[in-house]
Amino acid sequence: MYLVFGIIFTSVIVTSCSYNTKDFNSVPDFSPVRADLGYAPSRTAQTYPLPPRESNYSLYRASGNSFFRDPRAMQPGDVLTVQISINDRASLNNKSDLKSDSSSKYTIGTGYSFMDRIAGSLEGESSNQSKGDGKIERQENIRLSVAAIVTDVLPNGNLIIRGSQEVRVNHELRILNIAGVVRPRDISGNNMIEYDKIAEARISYGGRGRISEIQQPPYGQQLLNQISPF
């Protein structure tokens, strides 16, 4: 019996450990560069402009177009800057109240009595009451910039971008990932684009390290929360 309790106690202690053994007593490691760019060539044939042709007998050269336009990301491998400025606030308050009462009474009488067993009555009452109250408040404020790489060009000219940024401060690693589809016309003259102009935007901001481990409940507590009926 003591052996069984000892095994259970040891299992709870081991599963309750919330530290990652890989990062134990060490700083979190960075991800390899270009590890999660997810570049996948498009199956649709792509067409790109041909290089300018030399014109030896003209004062105008097509290669001089770059002097009259701002450099912007247009081809796979080009880099652009994404400005992320999120300041959202939402408040939701729901309240419901349900109450129902019912009462019924039945009486049976025949005018005769045989040992006082013919006449009778039946009564019933029921009551039901339900109340619910829910409130959600959310506020997010994120301001940062991240460089993204053009990974593919769609047939209509839109660009698929993906970027990642990792910053390690002491024993905490902050990770920012962004991906989506942008139109070349939305890229500003300084090769920057706002996050709200990115279609299918996927923005992830989190981290791992000592602070993240402390904020998460231990594994044993999470397991008990899943199986506990109370």
From Swiss-Prot:
A GO term from the CC aspect: cell outer membrane
Location of this chain's protein in the cell: Cell outer membrane; Bacterial flagellum basal body
MF term (GO), any: cytoskeletal motor activity
Signal peptide boundaries: 1-16
Membrane topology: Lipid-anchor
Keywords noted in UniProt: Bacterial flagellum, Cell outer membrane, Lipoprotein, Membrane, Palmitate, Signal
InterPro entries membership: Flag_Lring
Any Pfam family matching the protein: FlgH
Lipid moiety-binding residues (S-diacylglycerol cysteine): C17
Residues bearing a lipid moiety (N-palmitoyl cysteine): C17
GO biological process assignments: bacterial-type flagellum-dependent cell motility
First-listed, main subcellular location of the protein, grouped into a coarse class: membrane
Cited PANTHER family: FLAGELLAR L-RING PROTEIN (PTHR34933:SF1)
Subunit note: The basal body constitutes a major portion of the flagellar organelle and consists of four rings (L,P,S, and M) mounted on a central rod.
Function: Assembles around the rod to form the L-ring and probably protects the motor/basal body from shearing forces during rotation.
Recorded family membership: Belongs to the FlgH family.
HAMAP family: FlgH
Name used for this protein in its record: Flagellar L-ring protein
Organism of this sequence: Bartonella bacilliformis (strain ATCC 35685 / KC583 / Herrer 020/F12,63)
Gene that specifies this protein: flgH
